[in-house]
Amino acid sequence: MPIQILPPQLANQIAAGEVVERPASVVKELVENSLDAGASRIDIDIERGGAKLIRIRDNGCGIGKDDLALALARHATSKISSLEDLEAILSMGFRGEALASISSVSRLILTSRTAEQNEAWQAYAEGRDMAVTIKPAAHPVGSTLEVLDLFYNTPARRKFMRTEKTEFGHIDEVVRRIALARFDVAINLSHNGKLMRQYRAAPDPSQHERRLASICGPAFLQHALAISWQHGDLTIRGWVADPAASRTLSEMQYCYVNNRMMRDRLINHAIRQAYQDLLKDDQQPAYVLYLDIDPHQVDVNVHPAKHEVRFHQARLVHDFIYQAVTTVLQQTATPLLNINEDGEEIEAPRWQPENRVAAGANKYAQPEPANTVPVVRTSSPERTATTERSIARERTPTYHAGEPYQKQQGELYRQLVQPAAVNKPAAVSQPSAASAPVARQISTDEPLHGDNYSFGRVLTVFPPCYALIEYKQGIALLELTVAERWLKQAQLNPPAEGLRPQPLLIPLKLTLDKNEATACQRHQKLLATMGIELAVEHTRATLRAVSLPLRQQNLQKLIPELLGYLSQHEEISPDALATWISRHLGSEHEVWNVSQAIQLLTDVERLCPQLVKSPPAGLLQPIDIKAALATLTHE
């Protein structure tokens, strides 16, 4: 068979295979078009589960007569006109395929009128070439789309449709998701002439809980914990159910990105990880969450039905969601009870979001003092739903960042998961070739401030790891891998509260021998101080989190070596352990460039100013310029 161009109807039917899966898909596409048209009221009429009729009526801006024919054509849209528009999508639709695809597998009639027109017009496509016919009609300002006899000309697709009840159930779920996304729009859903759902508009934030209760039910609202976090251009808001209620509300999982309903695996993983110690493996969390992000930082054009997105900074988004949900759950969780040596019950310590000195003398993002509310406990289990919600709202912390989102430099990510420097750096331990129980420390007579000490300007880098720098009115060679090891050790020296663990995207499973498992259990507190969360069961271990300096390391190799080292010591200090780890970390760069060298030295000068004043052996080698000049001048 020779290559030939497909007829328009066949091409549209092929495209419909991706967009129009069932009647619920048609409802989703058409209602999203109504939302893009600025409608404040949408009426949805369904007959026989959508197989016989789907009618969507809205009071949006309408479509002009001259645009009606194009509205049913493929790749025709008013949403975008350039690649720049595609990279910053805010509208629900943008491909211009939905109406053409739907009209190719049904009898579609589009009636519309704009405020500027005196009369309405009706359009429908028919025939092998999908020719569009336009005629006058009576209609108020807005649009009505009628989809009759869905899949009438594709018997194979119609055969796979389920029962009327099942198909309407899917439509009901789609409408529920859309109603949760747009509180300001009134939506009515009817089936076979009977009004099934009536979601009244709730434009005022104080009315949102009423809409939430009508969609998710009073049981979810009673156990809902309000959440509202902001960091730069990232904002997350909504509700999460407390763990006790999540066990019976697991079907309530709604997530939106820029008001677009999503089933994104990264977001689901972050939420699930926040609940991981509060739910069993077969239980699921319940939540209604809205993530707002700069549209330039998310790609929505990666799924035919736009159910999934791709984030440019996936790790940032994952950790941001995890931290937000974890904080709310920790603040509202019931304290666990431990038994002390005297047999008395004592309250276990609970993690609280706080500003603390962490790895490398840094701080976590500062919350506004006005939003800091102490945790409220009550011994009475009979609190009303209103009281629960008001307390949850008061407890909800909102974090702000002063600098805008930086895609290239990842500045926001470092602010989120890495704390900011303080003026007085901690003393740095001297690396030693021998694994000494206690590392020797460099001391200074007076406090050092990073702003007053600098190695000098980086001139160039000699591969693989030597930087030529200006140094004390001359030049010197600096070994970057040695400087990197000093920096890692400074970041690994734990403060009194310990290093902050950063959850792994995928927990690491390890198989340990008997000595390693014993060492892990014996030094569990020490590992926690280093920000390492390692759960051991017999000879199996699960690594769930590590401190920030270890995030980019080969943990599959490093952790067993670390446990082997710990098995040789009954007791060991955190400083000695930090020294050992820093000497066994791999370099982040095989071959360094100038920008990487500048960034490294900037961090070293900030966290380890002692190295500038008294460089240790192996770090810096001054170059005798006078001897070189004497050779050139034959002196």
UniProtKB/Swiss-Prot annotation:
Keyword Hydrolase applies: no
NCBIfam families: mutl, PRK00095.1-1
InterPro entries the record matches: DNA_mismatch_repair_CS, DNA_mismatch_repair_MutL, DNA_mismatch_S5_2-like, HATPase_C_sf, MutL/Mlh/PMS, MutL/Mlh/Pms-like, MutL_C, MutL_C_dimsub
Protein name: DNA mismatch repair protein MutL
Any single Gene Ontology cellular-component annotation: mismatch repair complex
Annotated stretches, region: Disordered: 369-389
SMART domains linked to this entry: DNA_mis_repair, MutL_C
CDD domains named among the record's database cross-references: HATPase_MutL-MLH-PMS-like, MutL_Trans_MutL
Any GO BP: mismatch repair
Record's function text: This protein is involved in the repair of mismatches in DNA. It is required for dam-dependent methyl-directed DNA mismatch repair. May act as a 'molecular matchmaker', a protein that promotes the formation of a stable complex between two or more DNA-binding proteins in an ATP-dependent manner without itself being part of a final effector complex.
Keywords assigned by UniProt, alphabetized: DNA damage, DNA repair
Keyword DNA repair: yes
Family: Belongs to the DNA mismatch repair MutL/HexB family.
Transmembrane segments: none
A GO molecular-function descriptor: ATP-dependent DNA damage sensor activity
